Amino acid sequence: MSEAMVFSKIDEYTLFMSRSLQKSLKTFAEQVMALIYQYKDTLVEDRLALTNTLDEAVQILVDSGKEEADKLGFNIYSAVSRYISEIWASQSGQTTAAPPATDIDGLHRQLVALKNSLGQNAELYEQRCQLQAELRELQEFSENPAAAVEEIMQLKAQIDELKYGASNHNALVQEKRDLERHLADLRLSRQDTNSRLPQEIDRLRAEIEDEKRNLPHMDDLQRQRDELQRQLDTIRRRGNTSGVMAEIENIQRQIDDANSSASSEHELRMLRAEVETLRAQKSIVTRLEAENADLRRELQDIRGRAQEMSASQRYSANQAQELQEKAMQAEELLQQKIELRRQLHEALERADAGEAALRDKRRLEDEIKGLQLRLTENDFTKERSILRNEIQAKTTEIDTLISDRRALETKLLNKEAEVDQLLYEKQLLKTELNSYRGTNEDIDKLTFEKRQLVEELNDLREKTIKYDQLAREKAALETELKENSYNFDQLLEQKQQMRSDLNALREKAADYERVDRELRLKDKELEEKNAEIERLLEDRRVMRTELLHSKESATDVDSLIQEKRLRDRELAHLRDRMSEYERVVEERIQKEKENNLLKQRITELEQQQRTATVRETEMSALREKANELDGYNRERQAREHEINMLRDKALESDKLRQDNRVMAMELTELREKVQLLEKLQYEKRARDVEMLELRHKAMDVDTLVEEKQRLEMRLAELKIKVNNYDQLADDKARLQEQLKEMSDKLIEFEMIMDDNRRLKLQVKELDLKTANMEKLYEEYKKLEDQLKATKAMTSTGMGVSAASPAFYKTKSMRLTQQNNQMKNTTDNLLTRDIPKLIDKLIERPAGTTTMGRSGKF
């Protein structure tokens, strides 16, 4: 590889770097535009975040450029190293001496310096492009900042309106769907409860009729009692004791059946029938005195059986008490069922109240939607558009005023030049006045120029007044815009409050659903309890049959007691027993009457207690309903208050619109008045000018000069005021400083390019020196060959003749000295002179290494 190829590689590297820089700058510009578009909304609010992201993008771009530069530098280094290796290979064919390592190190250093300089150039070029882009942005922003900010605010407002409209629409659609679903669920639950209630009522009525049907009728019991009495009379008339026992057993079984199925009144009637039978037995006692002895033995047996019968009666009384307890439990279950039914009815009434509340809620929502539509119609969009148009007009007027001010500045500069000329002319006039007194024409000319200056000063003053007035109007309009946006934010907060109220209503509806589910569960529990009641009734029937069987087993004892009573012939004992029995019967009848009265009293008290509990539950339900109605009324009043507030706000918005219109009319009137004032001021100014002309014609040149100085002072004050109004001069100075910095960086860049050119020239010189070194090396080889030849000749000459040893000795010494000098010169070139030359060419500062930024070299 030749040096031309090496330099072509370097040129390709520089071209590639320039192209890659152009591409990277293009991509960087695209990234910057994308970032600006992405952060368009937050350009004013979060400018720091935008600048940070831009800095990160620039850093990534610079790093990628460095990596590409390192890759290309490595390729160039490999090409140069191949070139050097080829050179040394070509030289190694002529000599076996290895090349010194110092040459390669020097080339390494040279290449590293070249690559560093190119990397610095690329970085400087990137920084220059970045600074130019920032400078361009700042110039655009400084030329028209109000338009950029206004455009950004308009886009942000449009995006916010679109987002708000989309969210509002989605929320309303979702709320509508939720309300429709909830209403459908309520209707289904109400249909289920309405279809279930008549079924439950019919089932309960059927159960009551079955119970009534199972109970024995009073007529049947009376008929059975008459038949038993008639059979007993026939048996007594017959007097057959053998057949009497069987018939008595049958009658006793029938009596037991009747007693088991009859109530306490039937038992009293049966006891009275037994008393009548005992009285009838008194007539039979006279006929049974003969059988008294036999009956005594039987009497003892009867006493034992009587004891057994009393024990069985106690057992039957315990069973009856258990049955009464079970009946009480059944009555309690029925009371619980009635209470649950009542709660179900209350829940249905609450559901009706909830439906009424939902209807009122829908009505309120319709009113709110109407108000929202009215508010969206009155959404201050028109006012905002009007205000924005007015602000834009004001900004245009301000821009025109700024342009006028710049024009006035130019005019002022011109006037300053004219004033300088006037001063110069004044000096000339003074010289002429010294020579001869001035004429009236010069005085008229000066007065005319003075009048023009006064008019220009008045125009400047009026324009500054207009500028201040427009700035105040702009500030007032901006405050109005902020107030309107604040009112709109308040409306949004009220809407959020209404949404929270809707969520509360939804939670109440969920509570109603939960109550409905609980009532359904309680209905299931009632059904289970009804099944338990039926099971208890079945157990009662079974126990009733068992009692009948037990009473059938006790009929033998009763028959023996009757036989004992019939056969007892002892009148005294029988009378005593009969009297005692009658007394016991009367006491029992009285106790039964008292028990019946107590039972009636207990039933009445229980009924009163039940009615009281029902009334208490009804009162509690009514209280709950009253509380719910109060809460609903409070919510309704709050809603109505909110609606009234919204209506008031709508009226206030209408008033604000009307006020805006009135203000616009007032503005037009004020503008007309300002125009009239301008006309009056113009006329007054004309009159003042005429008066000043009349006065100045009578003045001397010195007074004109003094007035001119005063006007100059006024011009200087106006300049100071103009500089205070605008700060563009500071921006201009800052931009000029940036331009100076950029120009300095460009100068540095040009210096670096000059250094690169100088390095290329130094590389060429180094190549020339390497060529000279090759020539010297060839001469050195030739001298070595000559030395070898002379040595050979001396060796042959020594063998031929030894006549002149001193001659040969001096010649050989001369040749050795020449060879030593050549060796020293070549060694000095290879070891000292060439590295010094390379270091001098590279001009590497002390402390630097041959490694690059990436650490590859």
UniProtKB/Swiss-Prot annotation:
GO cellular component labels: cytoplasm; median body; microtubule; ventral disc lateral crest; ventral disc microtubule array; ventral disc overlap zone
> In Gene Ontology terms, what is a biological process of this protein?
microtubule cytoskeleton organization
Gene Ontology MF, one: structural constituent of cytoskeleton
Entry annotated with the keyword Cytoplasm: yes
The knockout outcome noted for this protein's gene is: Morpholino knockdown has defects in ventral disk formation and an abnormal ventral disk structure in a nondomed or flattened horseshoe-shaped conformation. The lateral crest of the morpholino knockdown is discontinous and mispositioned. Glass substrate attached morpholino knockdown trophozoites have a significantly decreased ability to withstand normal and shear forces, and they have aberrant plasma membrane contacts with the surface, including those of the bare area.
Give the top-rank taxon of the lineage listed in the UniProt record for this protein: Eukaryota
Q: Which UniProt keywords apply?
A: Coiled coil, Cytoplasm, Cytoskeleton, Microtubule
Q: Where in the cell is it found?
A: Cytoplasm, Cytoskeleton
Cysteine disulfide links: none
Coiled coil region boundaries: 169-546, 571-793
Can the keyword NADP be found in this entry's annotation?
no
Q: What is its main location?
A: cytoplasm
Q: What is known of its domains?
A: Shows an alpha-helical coiled coil structure (30 repeating heptads).
- Role played: Structural component of the ventral disk involved in maintanance of a domed conformation of the disk required for proper attachment. May have a role in immobilizing the microtubules between cell divisions.
Official protein name in the record: Median body protein
